[in-house]
Regions:
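Intrinsically disordered, metal-sensing/regulatory segments
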Residues: 1-259
């Protein structure tokens, strides 16, 4: 039990806070020109985790496939509604069009900053629960879920940091608050562990819910941002980074199985 708890804490900490710290480093070093590549990488990681790992694991259980497909459908609708409520999709446009999207006055910037932090916290809690469910199914699946969360949060946190720095002023203050919001992933992971323990029959459904969240974010959020008129070379780079995301998750899971 202790090992499982610490494994979940480490996995959710890397995914939640790690993504914020990496985003801060990349925002300073790479700026916005590599954001599109990160979006492609994240989309590939999310789709690979959902379709190649989480869903197959869920359907290997004795749960009725009809019930799992219904859960997948309801999950997609649920995340769509959260998106509309600006809790899940709270600011996924951040960082992709700063000049037009973030041209707010000082008051609205401050309000937007707290909206971003609230949305990040809700999002992080949900991620933590789903990562915990993956770890409790098997270790390699938990690693895949953590990598997917890490990958798709990095480009979003790069945008979030820009909004928070504008609304809260100092860069360190913005980074600290975003790290605290990302740390809610650990809280979600612990809550998930203690809720699921003794109720392992829920695991297939939680894996499907995790899949629906990953598929929704990839197809409704990330990939539409890549649908622009680009040259053949730029389009090829998008595809290569998408495949790199798929390969990254696949290699990570395979390595965990081998070791």
């Amino acid at each position: 039990m202790t090992i499982s708890v610490w494994t979940i804490i480490l996995g959710t900490l890397c995914a939640g806070v790690g993504s914020v710290l990496i985003a801060a480093l990349l925002a300073r070093a790479l700026m916005a020109r590599f954001t599109q590549h990160l979006l492609s990488l994240a989309a590939g990681a999310l789709l690979a985790t959902a379709f190649l790992h989480l869903l197959p694991e869920a359907f290997e259980s004795e749960t009725q496939p009809h019930s799992l497909f219904l859960t997948l459908l309801l999950g997609l609708i649920f995340f769509f509604l959260l998106d509309k409520a600006e809790l899940w999709h709270h600011g996924h446009e951040h960082g992709h069009d700063h000049d037009s999207s973030h041209d707010h006055d000082t008051g609205s910037s401050l309000t937007g900053s707290w909206a971003v932090l609230t949305g990040d916290s809700v999002h992080a809690f949900g991620d933590g629960v789903l990562v915990a469910a993956a770890f409790m199914t098997n270790f390699s699946l938990g690693v895949a879920a953590s990598v997917a969360v890490l990958a798709h949060e990095i480009p979003h946190h790069m945008g979030d940091l820009a909004v928070l720095q504008r609304g809260l002023g100092q860069g360190r203050n913005a980074l600290l608050k975003l790290c605290l919001a990302g740390g809610v992933t650990v809280v979600g992971g612990l809550a998930g562990f203690f809720l699921i323990e003794g109720h392992e029959a829920w695991l297939p459904f939680l894996l499907v819910i995790a899949s629906s969240s990953y598929v929704y974010v990839a197809l409704a959020d990330l990939i539409p941002q890549l649908q622009k008129r680009l040259s053949a070379a730029e389009t090829a780079m998008q595809v290569l980074w998408l495949l790199a995301g798929i390969a990254m998750v696949t290699v990570a899971v395979h390595w965990m199985h081998v070791h």
